[in-house]
Amino acid sequence: MINNLYKMFLGDSPNWYKNTIIAFLVINPITLLIINSMGLNGSFIVGWMILLEFIFTLALALKCYPLQPGGLIAIQALFLGLTNPYSLLHEIEHNIEVILLLVFMVAGIYFMKNLMLTIFTKLLLTIHSKTKLSLMFCFVSAFLSAFLDALTVTAVLIAVAVGFYRIFHLANSGLAFSTSTHDYQDDSSLSEAGIEDLENFKAFLRDLIMHGVVGTALGGVCTIVGEPQNLLIANVAGWEFIEFMIKMAPITVPVFIAGMITCFAIEKFHIFGFGNHLPLRIKNIFHEFNDYEIAQSTDESRLELYIEMLVGIFLIIALALHLAAVGIIGLGVIILLTSFKGITHEHDLGDAFKEALPFTALLVVFFGVVSVIADQQLFTPIITFVLAQDASNQAPIFFVANGVLSAISDNVFVATIYINEIKDALDLNIISRDQFDKLAIAINTGTNIPSIATPNGQAAFLFLLTSSLAPLINLSYMRMVIMALPYTIVLSIVGFIAVVINL
């Protein structure tokens, strides 16, 4: 009985992983009990332990989806009294826009995948230089993220990459492009040539996706709509779209230029896992797919593309003008696309929600860990230290502190805590309005730029790590950290220098 229960626990995860999670769950309450009995603040120490344990589950996302082990740790935190359901609900309410975005916008993008795949296939076949293609992915992702939203753009990138992978898999399994039932996660049907090319193709897709997702961070920091915390900071500071962009520009423009130079350099010199080219044999598959699409094109399929294009234009305008919360716009996209494309059966709609809902559940679990950080004031000593510094040094220190904390927790949460702290300091006349503006800029850039160091720093990175694409292209937590490392180093240094010079 116990053996069967152990086998079922966390499914087919390795035994050492299961044992580690069990050890966490046993050690946490014992540690809390012992430290409290010594008259020390056990909740603070165990709170940090739970944060690090949750990061561990994210780091090993390919061994076991983090929802289950991370969820068990979060449930234990509730039972140990490190937080409570009301604090968790408060965090969920605070981040409801992000949750709506994941539920509806990602599903909306699913119904636009034909248009996305057509556009990106043309780009893949038109741009012959891998370096130019990488720069294009990075630039377009940055541009779109500045006016749309980093998570939305990441959803597009994932949809496109999965589409590319499916085309490759169909061709190398000897199947027609029209086959809809093929399981592209099963490599047993691949030809010998396909197996040889598979790793090269995975590496090529990893390159493009990582350039693209870093691009979302480069663009996302620039405007109010780019990242959820930007809107929060702008609301507290009372900045409109243009004012926000102008205030951030002295930091964000040099960082963006440095990002594009970094993209060029790592592709040119084939470092940090980049510089993987698309073999000619694989490129020919996409030429064949393009020819197939043209040959199969009918008035109805062309009309579908036009509908997707018009709804895409509506999406861009609605997001750029912030006509509603991103998730509500996403729901509008679903309704428009499914209505005019005639997708009215429930099971056809259900497929669109499969990608995002597991991650949405994981994000809610993450908010449980965030509520532990808030209730146990895990970051308070750092905040107190920063606010105690000389005014001229506060902005650079805020930039660094925000970056470090965002990388290990979540940039939305860190930005929320810091912006509220400096708003309280402004209201109490501890700092001037000019100093408040400088610190708000440092908080925004600090939470957005260095947080690319780890996947848990940015929601877009975490979404990519836990998506169905990550295991397909062997994109693990540590591989993401290593591939993001040149960007992390260069952008953090350039951002820090820009903060020191301009603030």
Feature locations, PLM:
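Transmembrane-helix boundary/entry motifs in multi-pass membrane transporters
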Residues: 93, 125-133, 202, 295-299
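Hydrophobic transmembrane alpha-helices of multi-pass small-molecule transporters
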Residues: 1-107, 114, 242, 247-381, ...
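Short hydrophobic alpha-helices at membrane interfaces in multi-pass membrane enzymes
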Residues: 134-138, 206-209, 309-310
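Membrane interface segments of multi-pass transport proteins and intramembrane proteases
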Residues: 119-130, 346-351, 386-389
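Hydrophobic residues within the alpha-helical transmembrane core of Major Facilitator Superfamily
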Residues: 75, 139-143, 214, 218, ...
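Membrane-interfacial helix-loop connectors
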Residues: 60-95, 144-211, 228-249, 356, ...
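Transmembrane alpha-helical segments of multi-pass membrane transport proteins and ion-pumping complexes
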Residues: 102, 106-114, 118, 130-133, ...
